[in-house]
Amino acid sequence: MIYRSTGRVDVGVSAIGLGGHEYLPDGRSRGFNENANLAVTPGYLYEGFGQEKRKAVLAAAYEHGINLLDATIDSEKEALGRNLSEMPPPYEVYVQTRPEGMVYSYDPHNARLARYDLLQAEVARGLDLLGRTRLDFLNLGFLQGALDHDPDYLRKVAEGLARLKREGLIRYACADTFSGEGTYLRQIEQDCFDGIFINLNFADDGAVGKVLPAAADRGMAVFAREAFMKGALFRMGEEAGIVDRNSLARTALKWVLSQRQVTAVMVGVDTPEQLASNVSVLDDPEMAAEELSILERVRETASYRDYVAGKREQFGQ
């Protein structure tokens, strides 16, 4: 395993992190694709999370030296906390999560994130689910509408994060958004975040131009997600006639890890074998001729071009 730190995140985190998603038989993630409203309802727990299949994935993560773990919804938080208690890791691990029902489009204007009393209570509730006394990475994903609605929004968020750190409830904070480049740059410029959590892949690379360099200039960690484009990568591969999904996935991961500002890439896997294939890219992280050829073949597909156009518009480019 490769470990990386930055000026603001002074612990070594594994270059590949493990996401908290568990999966339905058809490959879609659990929770959101069962009932999206219930998935983000604070306190709602789906049955069957954190069972033997997930424990096998977590055990494999330990074997590979993965120390960066992410949990999204309450079902994932509770399962991760339970599994870490049942299967204590052989080294220190770092956990990221987000306030339930307060981020992205789940709360109008993300107003509750800017109220310290509500944010503090939600962080404490999440810590109880995780069985931890301090959260390593608090992810705050708010949209541009929050900034437009409240000119003091970023100041309030910054003050709240500083208080959470002083009270020992969080160690680091990560900026996140789905509003694109301009919002990320304002989050970075506020100088209250220690890292960013961002969609990044070879078909959604808008952040490479300004956002990643801006984060790196401030010593922030860059945590990348969606290397596989929520499965769109494999549909592009089918169109290009690429039958080896593992090679396609490894190529996509290598592209992300080749961006010099990237600290870690988060992956979602269903089996230990999938995780082992993903981690194997670190044995030889340089792009080989065969992998460069795979990229070119995918880039020639209509589905790739359509995906790129949509993502560039979404990112504000």
Stretches with model-predicted labels:
Residues 70-79, 102-105, 146-149, 201-207:
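Acidic-and-aromatic substrate-binding clefts and catalytic sites of carbohydrate-active enzymes
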Residues 6, 62, 67-68, 85-87, ...:
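Structured C-terminal cap/extension of enzyme domains
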Residues 1-94:
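N-terminal binding-site loop/beta-alpha segment at the start of enzyme catalytic domains
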Residues 8-10, 82-94, 127-133, 187-191, ...:
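Acidic (Asp/Glu)-rich catalytic clusters
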